[in-house]
Regions:
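Solvent-exposed, non-transmembrane segments of extracytoplasmic/periplasmic domains
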Residues: 39-198
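Hydrophobic single-pass membrane-targeting/anchoring helices
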Residues: 1-41
Length: 198
């Protein structure tokens, strides 16, 4: 219940703040899943074939499409939890890591939205910001938010990545317990690199 609960807490804090685009945890939104994919190769979309048609977009190995307008390769054996059509979470079999991805319509300045959410996250137990900074993701402006918090006596580490593309906002997030950090970061990196906007 720790991972799912951690996600719920984050969702409440972010919702109260107008939350970062697609984030639901007291610092992010958790989701169960582990990646075993290879880095995605960004594509500008399907290439034209015969006049008026296009070739379907190719996905990274192991990636599957989600209703939110994206595809990603999630770990085998992780529990899938669909929050909404545009938000999906995966939880590792041991419950020590969650992955989440979501999409929504872009609303204003991404960094300002996340700063507001971060201010509200101070309500969480033992919340400690590590960083909240602008970045890029595949050439798009992005925001990275990293922090720690405690839920039901269990420490958690969160890494959230948000970016806007073509009028939509996307998030690729993870929450994990510190004792699985090495594997959790490897899994998150693989899942993040497989993320493809459709």
């Amino acid at each position: 219940m720790g991972v799912v609960t951690a996600g719920a807490v984050v969702a409440i804090v972010l919702a109260a703040a107008g939350g970062p685009p697609d984030d639901n945890r007291a610092g992010g939104s958790p989701s169960p899943s582990s990646a075993r994919s290879q880095p995605a190769t960004p594509s500008d979309g399907p290439s034209p074939t015969v006049e008026g048609t296009s070739r379907p977009q190719s996905l990274p190995p192991g990636a599957h499409r989600e209703a939110g307008g994206f595809a990603w390769a999630t770990p085998t054996g992780w529990r899938r939890d669909i929050k909404t059509g545009a938000e999906v979470h995966y939880t590792s079999p041991d419950g020590k890591q969650e992955l989440a991805a979501k999409s929504s319509l872009a609303r204003g300045d991404l960094m300002e939205t996340w700063r507001t959410s971060e201010q509200n996250a101070h309500q969480g137990k033992d919340y400690r910001k590590i960083r909240l900074e602008e970045s890029t993701f595949r050439g798009n402006p992005a925001v990275v938010w990293e922090y720690t918090f405690t839920l039901e006596g269990v420490p958690w580490h969160a890494r959230l990545l948000g970016f806007n593309e073509n009028g939509k906002s996307y998030q690729i997030n993870t929450w994990y317990q510190p004792d699985v950090e090495t594997q959790a970061l490897k899994t998150y990196g693989e899942v993040r690199d497989s993320f493809t906007v459709l």
